Amino acid sequence: MRIQAPAKINLCLFLGPPRRDGRHSLCSLFEPLALADRIEVAESDRDRVICPGVVGENLAARALAALRERGWKRPPLRVEIAKRIPVGAGLGGGSADAAAVLRLAAGEVPDIAEIAAELGADVPSQLVPALALVSGAGEIVERLPAPTSHAVVLLPGGGGLSTRDVFAEADRLGLGRPRAELDAIAARLRQVAGEGASPLDYATELVNDLEPAARSLRPDVGEAMDALRRAGAPFVFLTGSGPTVCGLFADEGAAAATAAQLGRDDAIVCEAGRAPDGT
């Protein structure tokens, strides 16, 4: 069986105060990309997850183990992941892989969403990759109509950026908003994104509260954003906790033209807003 695990971007991310469990409340619009990891699943003599290029435990392996702990009876599986989503780039690659494994047990194991939330903040939204308004600490997912077709240029940067470090820096900088403000923002995002508009139509609403923290830790984030603007991107933003910077475009042709002008080997052009076939 071949399945795909699409990357995601955060079109916006509004940060709330720390919660008692140490996590942060947030309000964000997630959308899938055509960029996806490719996963081969086959029966085997034992469960194993193979992911060349990823050091240490893989979230997909944890997802498979969690399914077994909940009593999933399907025969042992070999899960081999061909990474196409840059690792540690804030594009949700590990979460996408974990969600793809969880989807294998849909209808067979109860409380899949609960397992997803235990695995990580980005996993619940990736169970059904689609434009979604995400709140809580990532576990509350409200799916929205697919947006008008558009495209992105991604500049992943290098070296990764620890989510934990970015949130800690955000706390140090005092970037969190009151919970009541998050609720008002969620209502506004639901209104502007709820009828299938392109994000370019409501770009003024798209803010990432983590951007100052990411730029503080990685000055090259700001440099990448400036480069995209100079190359003509109509709207530029940081996705998630970074370090990936995105330029938003009406179509892939415009995105490709800007990527060519940038002249960077790491630039990725892809369609946004819809998951690829085979997800």
Segments (PLM) and residue ranges:
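Phosphate-handling active-site elements
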Residues: 69-80, 104-121, 252-264
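Glycine-rich beta-strand-to-loop/alpha-helix junction loops that act as flexible
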Residues: 93-94, 239-243
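DPxDG-like acidic metal-binding loop motif
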Residues: 89-114, 125, 129
